[in-house]
Amino acid sequence: FRSTHNNFLFDIHIYNTDILSTIFDIPLTVYTHSTLKGYFNDALQRLRIEGYFPRLQYKNNYIESGMILCENPADHIRARVRLTNLKKKGAVNLSLDAQAKDDNVSTTLDWGNNAAATYSGKLAAVAKFLRTSGEKSLLKAMVDVNPTDVILNDTLWKIHPSQVVVDSGRVDVNNFYFSHQDRYVRINGRLSE
């Protein structure tokens, strides 16, 4: 058995995506020069993929300033996505950050608009994945929702700490609480098949 060394660099420049629509029926149009570059180093077990997409359309979504990054700089893997989704009445900036290490994934989603009424906020959670015991081991996820703020129509709302557990086809929501003064949404319960 001979060991291989899969070390490579790539630098892809994208000018025209007509072939994706024609052959693969992917509804993607790139309007300006976009790039996808990175590397994979087998010996160091490192990877990095970064993409820049200044202006594109996927189905009916118009996107500007798109950026993706995926890398494993140390003992974790990190992914970032940033974009501006253009709407008829303004734009929405979106940012997704995720880090994974030791069966844990930390995720933060930020959004904000630039219209007359503000809609913005953050959703942050940490998911822990583990296997259930027994004859047929299943994947279980425990998602801890972190406290954050959300602005809906210029009004500050709070997301309070809660937990969601996904186990064997069941989803348990434990004390999800979203509030503004005396108005709130509280969810406790189980979704099942």
Give the ranges of each region predicted by the language model.
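Interface amphipathic segments
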Residues: 1-193
